[in-house]
């Protein structure tokens, strides 16, 4: 079961981006990786594509973009407690809406 989902605030706990934080843009469950906003930037060299009509809208040259990071290098960030949590989450039924909500196990704050 995956504890990190799209839209979660995460912190990098190992690697060259250690200590950096951002919001998860995309999860790739088959590869166990995630793309985090503003982290793990790589440079791609893109040519101008002349075959499509969208060629004018595409950026060309050196383009900075986010590369995937393994989920094992990420930890959820509890914004209320201002600390990282290693994914211990429990689901609690919300009495008003009758839906499950994700709660940090350590601080009992909702995500």
UniProtKB/Swiss-Prot annotation:
Pfam families linked: KOW, ribosomal_L24
MF terms in GO: rRNA binding; structural constituent of ribosome
Cellular component terms per the entry's GO annotation: ribonucleoprotein complex; ribosome
Alphabetical GO biological process terms: translation
Disulfide bond among keywords: no
Annotated spans, Disordered: 43-62
Keywords per UniProt: Ribonucleoprotein, Ribosomal protein, RNA-binding, rRNA-binding
Domain of life according to the entry: Bacteria
Keyword 4Fe-4S: no
Role noted for this protein: One of two assembly initiator proteins, it binds directly to the 5'-end of the 23S rRNA, where it nucleates assembly of the 50S subunit.
SUBUNIT field: Part of the 50S ribosomal subunit.
Family under the similarity heading: Belongs to the universal ribosomal protein uL24 family.
Name of the protein in its database record: Large ribosomal subunit protein uL24
Organism: Mycoplasma pneumoniae (strain ATCC 29342 / M129 / Subtype 1)
Lineage: Bacteria, Bacillati, Mycoplasmatota, Mycoplasmoidales, Mycoplasmoidaceae
């Amino acid at each position: 079961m995956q504890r990190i989902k799209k839209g979660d605030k995460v912190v990098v706990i190992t690697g060259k981006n250690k200590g950096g934080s951002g919001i998860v843009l995309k999860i790739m469950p088959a590869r166990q990786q995630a793309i985090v906003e503003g982290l793990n930037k790589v440079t791609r060299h893109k040519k101008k594509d002349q075959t499509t009509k969208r060629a004018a809208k595409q950026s060309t040259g050196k383009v900075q973009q986010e590369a995937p990071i393994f989920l094992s290098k990420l930890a959820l960030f509890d914004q209320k407690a201002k600390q990282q949590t290693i994914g211990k989450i429990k689901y609690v039924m919300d009495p008003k809406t009758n839906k499950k909500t994700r709660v940090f196990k350590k601080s009992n704050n909702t995500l």
